[in-house]
């Protein structure tokens, strides 16, 4: 297949639309089901690069959940705790611990379930049956992987009345060294961002505390590779083999740090005993439960515990999660990693990161206020590496 005609471009009025190879060669993909759209393919090709690089960097199966050309999370295949399984709605999945790919999917899809509603999924490895069973029951636009087990493919083909978008990519495909795009009829050309992110990038530790364990280095690598494919400005919190908060597309660095931090806090609080034991009505679907949990934790527009409201969601009226309970639970967090796609211009980013349990940081350095940022890290006993690598993505 040398080109694929799309229903439309970014918006329904943008026609005609298609994808094709500039040199007239075959596309490196097969479409096994559905008819992916313009934004679907933007998500697919960005997300595939992310998981491919994670697998190469860490040697573990990797999965990411994408929405509007940015990841909601990315994760590698590490088994989940019982509480995390419950928080991710996968505690009923048989054989989960036996499939590293399924563990990576459970983590990535379960991190920011509100934002992953209608996501695009990328997998570094051949999709197995366990992973397909989990993906089948989530609201998703499509998936890209280097292959699919026959039974897994048949499971996925039943989604969306047989119209679920399933793309298979050639894992050996390597794009040209130069990439191009047009804006307002003007062609932009640049070299692809081929810089390899690995442990060596974290060798310049500028803080007094220089103890960077392997687990922290892994999480920093996950954060940085995630940022490489996130719309800038961006900041990413990561822990235990997964990104837990992505702050994407903000014009201010501190707003990135706050947004990602609030997402990380929500992820932690989903594992609070009160949240895990909310008495949901049996007829309440998974997306509705996600909305209610978010409201319960963050006290959004609707008080889900109030008289006249709780009856819509719960069998019995739950006690609210108080500010004191949230503060106490969040105070137990530790060893969180944080990556930034550009330098921190002020130490307020460090102050906010500390509130979400951050101990390890990787950022390029180069600010005129680097000394103030380093001093703030030292006050909290943090470990910070200057990686010297800006990771803007547009």
Which residues does each predicted region cover?
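Active-site-proximal loop/turn and secondary-structure-junction residues that shape catalytic pockets
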Residues: 70, 127, 239-240, 344, ...
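Active-site loops and adjacent core secondary-structure elements that bind or stabilize anionic groups
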Residues: 1-201, 216-234
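Flexible, glycine/charged-enriched surface loops at secondary-structure junctions
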Residues: 57-65, 166-169, 232-239, 269-280, ...
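Conserved helix-loop functional segments at active or binding sites
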Residues: 53, 229, 266-270, 355, ...
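Glycine- and Gly-Pro-enriched alpha-helical subdomains that act as flexible
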Residues: 72-114, 244-343
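Bateman/CBS regulatory modules and CBS-like beta-alpha motifs in cytosolic regions of diverse proteins
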Residues: 126, 205-215, 344
């Amino acid at each position: 297949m040398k080109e694929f005609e799309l229903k439309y471009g970014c918006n329904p009025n943008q026609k005609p639309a298609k994808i094709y190879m500039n040199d007239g060669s075959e596309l490196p993909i097969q479409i096994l089901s559905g008819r992916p759209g313009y934004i679907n393919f933007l998500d697919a090709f960005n997300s595939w690069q992310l998981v491919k690089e994670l697998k190469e960097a860490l040697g573990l199966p990797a999965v990411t959940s994408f929405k509007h050309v940015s990841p909601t999370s990315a994760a590698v295949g590490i088994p989940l705790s019982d509480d995390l399984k419950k928080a991710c709605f996968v505690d009923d999945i048989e054989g989960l611990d036996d499939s590293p790919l399924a563990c990576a999917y459970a983590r990535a899809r379960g991190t920011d379930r509100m934002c992953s509603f209608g996501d695009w999924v990328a997998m570094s490895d051949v999709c197995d049956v366990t992973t397909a069973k989990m993906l089948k029951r989530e609201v998703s636009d499509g998936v890209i992987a280097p292959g699919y087990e026959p039974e897994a493919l048949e499971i996925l083909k039943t989604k969306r009345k047989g119209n679920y978008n399933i793309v298979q990519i050639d894992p050996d495909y390597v794009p040209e060294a130069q990439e191009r795009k047009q804006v307002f009829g003007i062609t932009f050309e640049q070299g692809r961002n081929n810089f390899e992110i690995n442990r060596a990038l974290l060798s310049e530790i500028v803080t007094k505390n220089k103890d960077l364990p392997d687990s922290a280095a892994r999480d920093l690598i996950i954060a940085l590779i995630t940022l490489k494919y996130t719309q800038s400005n961006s900041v990413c919190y990561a822990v235990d083999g997964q990104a837990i908060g992505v702050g994407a597309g903000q014009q201010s660095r501190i707003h990135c740090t706050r947004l990602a931090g609030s997402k990380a806090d929500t992820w932690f609080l989903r594992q609070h005993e009160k949240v895990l034991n909310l008495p949901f009505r049996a007829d309440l679907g998974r997306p509705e439960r996600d909305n209610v949990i978010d409201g319960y934790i963050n006290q959004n527009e609707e008080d889900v515990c109030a008289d006249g409201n709780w009856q819509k969601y719960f069998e019995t009226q739950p006690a609210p999660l108080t500010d004191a309970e949230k503060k106490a639970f969040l105070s137990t967090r530790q060893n969180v990693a944080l990556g930034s796609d550009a330098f921190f211009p002020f130490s307020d980013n460090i102050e906010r990161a500390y509130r979400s349990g951050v101990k390890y940081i990787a950022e390029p350095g180069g600010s005129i206020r680097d000394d103030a940022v380093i001093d703030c890290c030292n006050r909290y006993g943090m470990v910070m590496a200057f990686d010297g690598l800006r990771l803007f993505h547009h």
